[in-house]
Amino acid sequence: MIHFFHTLQGEKNAGFDVLYHNMKHGQIATKELAEFVRERAAIEETYSKSMSKLAKMASNGSPLGTFAPMWDVFRVSSDKLALCHLELMRKMNDLIRDINKYSDEQVKIHRKTKEEAIGTLESVQSLQVQNGHLQKTREGYHSKCVELERLRKEGVPQKELEKAELKCKKAAESFAGSIEKFNRAGGDFEQKMSESAQKFQDIEEAHLRQMKLLIKGYSHSIEDTHVQVGQVHEEFKQNVENIGIENLIQKFTEQKGTGKERPEGPVGFEEYLSSLASENSKKSRAKAFRIPGLGKRDKEPDSTVHVYFLQNNSPLEVDDEGFVIRADVKQNDIEKEGNFYSSDSDFDDEEPKKFHIQIRPVASSNRSNSAANEQELKATVGALTLPPNRVVSVKKQLSRRSEGEGESVPQRVIAKVEVCACRLSSTASGSDALFGPPLESAFKSHSFSGREQLQNAFAASEFFSKFYSSSLENVEDSGLDSPSHQPLGVSPDPTGWAAWPSSQSQSKDSINAASQSRGGSNRPTPSPNPAPSSQSNTEWMNDIIREGPYSQIMQDSSERLALAPPRSVRSKRSSVAITRKNSDFSRSLCSSPLPDPNASTCVLYSKMLNCAPAGLSRGPSPISLSAQESWPVAAAITEYINAYFRGGEHNRCLVKITGDLTMSFPAGITRIFTANPNAPVLSFRLVNISRVDHFLPNQKLLYSDPSQSDPDTKDFWFNMQALTLHLQREAELNPQASYYNVALLKYQASSQDPSRAPLLLSAECQRSGTVTRVSLDYHCCPATAPATQLTSVQVLLPLDHSATDLQCQPPAAWNAEERRLLWKLDDLSSVSGSGTLCASWQCLEVPRGPAPSLAVQFVGSGASLSGLDVELVGSRYRMSLVKKRFATGKYMAGCSL
């Protein structure tokens, strides 16, 4: 290898100056490299923003036509490409920080080298001075010699000749002294220059190695991005192939279909009825301008004719609740039930139509209660109002619906009355018979959790018994889900995109299904149990949750609260786990005293509802659908420590820590993920992982970046589609749960450092004949558990079957069947966490086997032994709780003899 010392000697000894300035040029190269990488990061950021704009353009694509679902494919692909280049920009910024850090270290090294090279600089200057003196003395000596030779040839007097010889001798002595000084300075220069040249060479080699490492990181980041871009492109092609033409057409028909009902058959001839001509002419009054065929009277048969034939041809039937059952219920009545807003042009000019409701409550032992309940029912019906944005009297609304709906109108009215009345009183003896079951019974088929059902957030934590990988390795970076837009069914799975129908279309399907089921027969069969009431209660609460009034109640006025709740849709995916907030709310409504019958029940309901804060849950993690509030999650870190202390020395031990990370999601967030397929990606970061040796993540739920350079942190983010499916499965298996635990990863750490163990042990065994004495010294390690306490501390010592005459200090419990001693110690901490245990016994024979070992058990909370911690990345989610706990596995101490 070429060395600076051999090649930078040269004329006038300028090699030192060349080496010093070359070292300074290294700083310039470092700064220029940082500027180059910064410019590349700016280019990547600009490209990422451009791709985000392109994704936004795709998301704003026309939702009309069969091609509309394909825009999701373009949006997801553009989002992922933007994420790839944004990630490259982040890596470039990290690289710039590394370059700047190296530049600072480089300045310190150069400053230190300059201080050390001052001696070399002085030797160079001294050598140059001595070289000048040497040249002068040489020239003086030579001139004196020439002068002496000239005088000798000229034959000058002896006296002058002696003077010339004396001057020549002095010049020779001066020249000899200069030679000696020059040689001495040259030797010093050679030694110091050799050392300095070696230092400069080491600095330059280290500089070039570091620069190559930085360039390699730059190249690796670009290569990873190119791989990710290739994966995104392959996924794009696969998604385009998966979404076939038939699927696009099917999705269009599901969303835009108008039904399979065909027009009625040929219309027959109808005879003229003169007896009803006057009534028909009276009923035909309408507005001056009216399109034929679109009015209500053109669409529906006359209610008077219907009543006439009903009275003359069939007897009236009365169900168990006292309502008159009419003979026919029109098919289109169901459609009217699902639509509050009528577009009939002649609605305002119609006169109110009268209908009769006959209430016959179930017989009760207390007749006064029945009469009071009837009065309360009348007051409640009088207080009912119409749906939002519809200022029409109850009388006109009821009369309008009575024209063609038959008995379905009073059934719906009484169903709504039952909801309000059930909230007002649960103490009246006849309330169940008159108004149906209480409000709580409407939720028996839904995920409803009361206060008594709420448990500790991690009490029932269950972990996966087996993960999806058999090797301890990192998660491959294959998903690249956008943090802002989760793909709606765009995945290599051919059925993935169609497995997430929109809530709107699903609700319409549910309405049609419910309408067909309710309107299938012309005459409903009476049943002893008020099924319509229970169904109405359930649908009413489902609709409140679906429409999201809790998020709007605080913003609207009390006038809005008094409006009747809209009709609902029962859907399989619309079931919601209502936690403690709704539990308290419903309990306070049902336990309130019975009010004055003349009071407005809905006004009382609105006052009670106004006291409840906005949101869907008030358990350990409140859920709100507001875009400004973050969604809560919780995490649990559980660790098990195994340790073995060799006999007599607490600083000789083997420690192994295994841990699990579990994340807990409130039940309400499942509905949010289902209703919002573009929910932000949940990301979290593990910090203080330098002591962890291996990670085993859940590869079906998590993604990570294997090229992260920080050895103390590791980032993960969720596959949101897989997470949503997992939470839905958990909700189906346990619909009453208020939270769902998801096991994320396992990890392992091993060490021979005694400071990693929270409790240090040192055991000794002394044998004297048949007597054996065992002592155990223990004390807490302050470096491991400075802020936590060890609880439930137990020490076990197994004994030989022939042991007798036991003596223990402090006293221990003796288990004769298992033949072991058990000490139960107080809680230990770093302040008061040391002590000694002693036990002695006598054997029938002299013991010759190995010394016994002691086992220790304890638990702790509030800290992790590995130091690992978890934090969320981003502001859309918040960590409401991080619970840390640890326990012992095999925690043993061997005795030294």
From Swiss-Prot:
GO biological process per UniProt: BMP signaling pathway; clathrin coat assembly; clathrin-dependent endocytosis; convergent extension involved in axis elongation; dorsal/ventral pattern formation
Segments for region (Disordered): 475-537
Domain MHD: 630-894
Region of interest: Mediates membrane-binding: 1-276
Subcellular locations according to the entry: Membrane, Clathrin-coated pit
Top-rank taxon: Eukaryota
Keywords, ordered alphabetically: Coated pit, Coiled coil, Endocytosis, Membrane
Protein name per the record: F-BAR domain only protein 1
Organism per entry: Danio rerio
Keyword Membrane: yes
Domain named F-BAR: residues: 2-248
Disulfide bonds: none
CDD domains per UniProt: F-BAR_FCHO1, FCHo1_MHD
Membrane-topology descriptor: Peripheral membrane protein
Pfam families with a match to the protein in the record: GMIP-like_FCH, muHD
Gene name for this UniProt entry: fcho1
PANTHER family to which the protein is assigned, alphabetical: F-BAR DOMAIN ONLY PROTEIN 1 (PTHR23065:SF6), PROLINE-SERINE-THREONINE PHOSPHATASE INTERACTING PROTEIN 1 (PTHR23065)
Disruption phenotype: Embryos display dorsoventral patterning defects analogous to the one associated with Bmp signal failure.
Coiled coil: 134-154
Family the entry assigns: Belongs to the FCHO family.
Function as written in the Swiss-Prot or TrEMBL entry: May function in an early step of clathrin-mediated endocytosis. May regulate Bmp signaling by regulating clathrin-mediated endocytosis of Bmp receptors.
Subunit composition and interactions: May oligomerize and form homotetramer. Interacts with acvr1l/alk8; linking this receptor to clathrin-mediated endocytosis.
InterPro entries reported for this sequence: AH/BAR_dom_sf, F_BAR, FCH_dom, FCHO1_F-BAR, GMIP/FCHO2-like_FCH, MHD, Muniscin_C
Ranges of Polar residues composition bias in the record: 501-520
Gene Ontology cellular component list: clathrin-coated pit; clathrin-coated vesicle; cytoplasm; plasma membrane
This protein's record includes keyword Membrane: yes
